Regions:
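Membrane-proximal extracellular/periplasmic loop immediately following the first transmembrane helix
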Residues: 29-82, 92-94
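Mechanotransmission and gating elements of multispan inner-membrane complexes involved in transport
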Residues: 142, 151-228
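Short helix-loop junctions at transmembrane helix boundaries
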Residues: 273-308
């Protein structure tokens, strides 16, 4: 009975650690998934933007001479509310403007590439919310309608699904005219350095860590998980101490029979190992079962490296 109680406690706490870790990783991924798809080395923002893509604007004269081959791509970004023409089903999204032949262009899993003006590619999380191929969407209350011609996956930024469109369409949406050649950032695929007055080049890891709210969220979950791991060790230690104290007379008999102290200590550690392994194994099975029943909209992602 006592050993079953130890296994149950290890199982419950380990399951909570795994569950919180999965939520933490899932939320963190939603902030950065679209950025990870680029497999880029760095990003160039306006210096005043304080490492924040949302606040960055690059004028044509600042970036036009920086393009060198296919390793640098222009990116436009704006937040958007998408809805149907009748005003129903408002959905929050992020809009990325890009050139369809750049390395920033998303992989399409359903539908076709955008070929005409005002055609867009959307992350499949919008599909989960009811958006279908061929749907016409308004963005930020615009009179212009944007047709969804394809879906991509694993493209979210700031926890919101991304809608991809051509740069000229983006400029018309954000600045009111495609003649305004502003962009939000330059994304650099290779390791080249860009030094230009008024611009700031950041590594992708530095840029991601400065996404508003990203770092506090990661730290909060990390402290919670660390505290639960510490509690697990404390509880396990207390249980094993109590069980060991209760068996003191038995260990005395074993010593009287000539059994070495090292073997007795080893047996205690083997008990701890077996009970812990059993509890952790049950927690892993419970986590796999949980993953099967959770809705797709839940930011839950199993990452065994995080558990380790």
């Amino acid at each position: 009975g006592r050993y079953r109680l130890v296994v149950a406690v290890v199982f419950l706490i380990t399951y909570m650690v795994f569950f919180l870790s999965s939520l933490s990783v899932g939320l963190a991924r939603l902030n950065r998934l679209a950025l990870d798809q680029w497999q880029a080395e760095s990003i160039v923002l306006s210096e005043y933007a304080n490492k924040n893509l949302i606040a960055s604007t690059l004028k044509e004269e600042e970036y036009s001479r920086l393009f060198q081959g296919d390793s640098i791509a222009a990116l436009g970004q704006t937040s958007a509310v998408a809805n149907y023409e009748d005003g129903t089903d408002k959905l929050n999204a992020q809009v990325f403007g890009l050139s369809w032949d750049s390395f920033l262009a998303p992989d399409i899993i359903e539908g076709r590439p955008a070929e005409n003006a005002y055609e867009v590619i959307a992350d499949k999380r919008l599909q989960q919310k009811g958006v279908k191929l061929g749907d016409q969407l308004q963005l930020n209350g615009s009179e212009r309608l944007y047709q969804v011609v394809g879906f991509t996956e694993d493209n979210s930024f700031f926890t919101q699904p991304v809608i991809f469109m051509d740069l000229d369409d983006f400029r018309e949406l954000k600045y009111g005219s495609s003649q305004v050649k502003n962009i939000s950032a330059l994304v650099v695929k290779d390791s080249q350095k860009i030094e230009e007055t008024g611009l700031s080049q950041l590594s992708m890891s530095d840029f991601i860590e400065n996404i508003p709210g990203y770092q506090p969220q990661v730290l909060t979950f990390s402290f919670m998980i660390g505290a639960m791991v510490l509690i697990t060790f404390l509880v396990l230690g207390i249980f094993m101490y109590i069980i060991t104290i209760q068996k003191t007379h038995l260990y005395g008999i074993m010593r009287a029979q000539g059994i070495a102290s090292g073997k007795i200590i080893a047996s205690i550690f083997w008990q701890i190992f077996i009970l812990s392994t059993l509890g952790i194994s049950l927690a892993v099975l419970a986590l796999l079962g949980t993953q099967l029943v959770l809705p797709a909209s839940m930011p839950f992602y199993s990452d065994w490296r995080a558990y380790a």
